[in-house]
Amino acid sequence: MATVQQTVESGIIPIVIELNDVVFFESSERLSRTFLTINSLDLGVLGYPQYRFVAHRTKQAYHLTERHLTKLMRIIPALVVDRPEISSYIVPVYARLLKSGELVDILLKALALYPEAYAGRVCIELSCDVLFEDLDEVREAMEQIRSMGFKTAISEVGDTFCPVFRVAELPLDYVFLDPAVITRLMADDAGERVVGSFISYLKDLGTLVFAPDAYDEATTAALRRAGCDGCVGSIVSGEDVVPADEIADETADETAQEIADETPVEETVEDSTETAPLDEITVGEADADTAEIGGDD
């Protein structure tokens, strides 16, 4: 299994940030969902879907969230100049980090490291798992995050098991719909009416509502009619994704040393069902000679 040092020596930067734009239908403003691309000699490139799974569901959640936020806040001053149309950079976060209080600690550390960063440009995106938690505790934690200047969002809203009416209990800036909502929207006229009413309900709460990828003009038109504010740019569309090497760390050596010097925090794991195969991406061990990106076959 290749070590971080071997990966860097091959000319590959192990971990970089990429941006996936969220396009508004009625304005030039944009949001940007950010994610880490993990490059491994053995595993290849672990992109957006895999990263979101790791960040939400495995024991790497704390480690990746901390690294993600720190790297993002370091480059935000430059991004604000280069891409003024983007009002928020969104970071996916596992709901249990909010409940445990670890997320607040991560944000405080990031602000202390980069006080020149614009907290108001960063949005914390929680999965809809948060709706199954104690809403009083969740609301208190989210209000604390917002008091620090950060925005908040929730994703995967509207799937079969999502308690959608609990969304009204949380302070949110953005809501990202589950793909199941789009399937219902495109099924028939009745589906379009139902989805339109659902989106209207969410917007009455004071949030902006965004859809997953819209791959064709018919879907985009239906989303507009339903009152959706915009949609996520396709992750496979080159024009919507900023290449990783444009906003990579200063040097590959620095990145490798950062990874080698840090040990993942794994206290968020409560049972073995959450450590799916992708949690084998242990990106921080004792030193650069032994740190691995990837696990045993």
Give the residues covered by each predicted segment:
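EAL-family c-di-GMP phosphodiesterase catalytic domain
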Residues: 1-14, 18-28, 35-44, 95-97, ...
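Catalytic core of bacterial c-di-GMP phosphodiesterases, primarily the EAL and HD-GYP domains
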Residues: 31, 62-137, 213
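A general structural motif
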Residues: 84-88, 117-121, 147-149, 172, ...
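Charged helix-capping and loop-helix junction motifs
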Residues: 105-109, 137-140, 189-196
